[in-house]
């Protein structure tokens, strides 16, 4: 993603995000707006780097706000979704995650915690926060094939107790 970095960072700034912190040990940046955190990972050999090699510039992980992540981990294990906690040599956040059907990591984040992993892993910078137009994210669209769509529907219904709606086809602007 280094080639796309200048364009992507300009787009993020144009959308109102601020580059607020740098990871203490890795080539990773934290961008924020309101309660939304975007992590831009350019670390060689990382999960994000491998995901980029397979999919190109894309989102490789999501932090999902769930009440009682420990219960979500238990439920994921009961449904045979393997839970990972990252590589203890490189990841210090300790957030549990499962792999989504399209290969992205789905992290379980407790909305009641102040997310101390941000303070533990990142050092703030002096970029001034911009006006916030986005406070939170409540919907995301993911491109996937039909089989992945069926797997995603099952995962979200079984694990998160979400009810599917009718599919929506969105044209690719490229």
Regions flagged by a language model, labelled:
Residues 1-24, 32-85, 92-168, 173-174:
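Glyoxalase I/VOC metalloenzyme domain signal
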């Amino acid at each position: 993603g280094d080639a796309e970095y200048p364009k992507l960072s300009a787009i993020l700034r144009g959308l109102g995000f601020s580059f607020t912190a740098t990871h203490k040990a890795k080539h990773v940046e934290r961008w924020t707006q309101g309660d939304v955190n975007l992590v831009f990972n350019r670390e060689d050999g990382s999960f994000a780097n491998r995901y980029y090699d397979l999919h190109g510039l894309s989102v490789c992980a999501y932090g999902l706000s769930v009440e009682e992540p420990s219960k979500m981990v238990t439920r994921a294990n009961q449904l045979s979704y393997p839970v990972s906690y990252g590589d203890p040599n490189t990841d210090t956040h300790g957030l549990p995650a499962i792999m989504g059907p399209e290969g992205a990591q789905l992290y379980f984040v407790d909305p009641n915690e102040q997310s101390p992993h941000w303070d533990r892993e990142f050092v703030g910078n002096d970029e001034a926060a911009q006006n916030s137009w986005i406070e939170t994210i409540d919907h995301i669209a993911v491109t996937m094939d039909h089989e992945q769509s069926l797997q995603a529907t099952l995962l979200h219904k079984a694990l998160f107790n979400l009810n599917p709606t009718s599919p929506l086809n969105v044209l690719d602007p490229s």
